[in-house]
Amino acid sequence: MSWYEQIEPNVLTYVKYSVEELGYSPRFTSVLDKTVVDDNGVPKKLPTVYIHMLQPAEVGNDLDNTEINGVLATIEIQIFSNNYNESQSLRTITLDCMKKLRFNVPMLPVTTNQGDYFLTIARYRRVVGGGDSDLITEL
């Protein structure tokens, strides 16, 4: 596994640990497949926190250009909950976690009422270098 492929699972592990430490127990996933969602795309268990790294872009090339030195990582977090207050609490906790990992917030979290559940979506972005131990080694 390349160093940049470790970013998503390590972010998920860090956020999951932080949320559970505060007494919440949502389902965490990095995949929204048929084992997690119903035919309408809604998670079968609420609340669910979906954490996914969008396709990263290479940054920080050197003159040799023989290896990937850094990537611009964008993490999307979607929170599905049937309780508005719970969704807002999870939003605040996940935002705090991402700021502690030094991510910027190019898209502030937005919560919408989807009828049977509330959906909060946020995106976080930062440059991660091959030597950034906080996101590459096990947290």
Per-region residue spans from a language model:
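A common structural junction motif
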Residues: 95-104
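Mid-chain, well-packed structural core segment of small domains
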Residues: 69-92
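Residue-level recognition of well-ordered beta-strand positions that form the cores
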Residues: 52, 78-80, 123-127
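Short, charged interaction patches at domain edges and termini
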Residues: 1-17, 56-70, 105-139
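Small/polar-rich, solvent-exposed N-terminal microdomains that initiate assembly or binding
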Residues: 1-63
